[in-house]
């Protein structure tokens, strides 16, 4: 089927979490009610959860089962390689050099946050 086959997303919601909640802020799009499958889509450095919203109607086909697309926002943090500018990033990037020290703490925190999202989807009936 060609892109844009009319399978427009049916529901839109934005979930903002209080600071004490370890769950990331997300944008969620459902193709129909009662989704049994989820796609968790991470954005890149400096982008945000809204960046991939427009592509969903181009990806979805009418004959597909109901889907939930979950677009989490990475935390805003200083990014060393960008002069310490605060932007959305899953972890700090120390430099462009492959030998640069990796932000293990930030990487592990992002892994934990994504695992929390995956668990939440399971609690919502996604197997």
Explain the meaning of each model-derived region.
Residues 2-3, 10, 14-126:
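Serine-hydrolase catalytic machinery in alpha/beta-hydrolase-like enzymes
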């Amino acid at each position: 089927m060609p892109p844009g086959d009319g399978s427009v997303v049916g529901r839109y919601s934005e979930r903002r979490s209080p600071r004490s909640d370890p769950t990331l802020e997300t944008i969620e799009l459902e193709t129909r009610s009662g989704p049994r499958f989820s796609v968790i889509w991470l954005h890149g450095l400096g982008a945000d959860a809204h960046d991939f919203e427009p592509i969903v109607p181009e990806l979805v086909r009418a004959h597909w089962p109901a889907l939930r697309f979950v677009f989490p926002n990475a935390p805003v943090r200083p990014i060393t390689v960008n002069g310490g500018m605060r932007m959305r990033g899953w972890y700090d990037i120390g430099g462009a050099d492959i030998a640069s020290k990796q932000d293990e703490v930030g990487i592990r925190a992002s892994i934990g946050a994504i695992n929390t999202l995956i668990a939440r989807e399971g609690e919502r009936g996604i197997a």
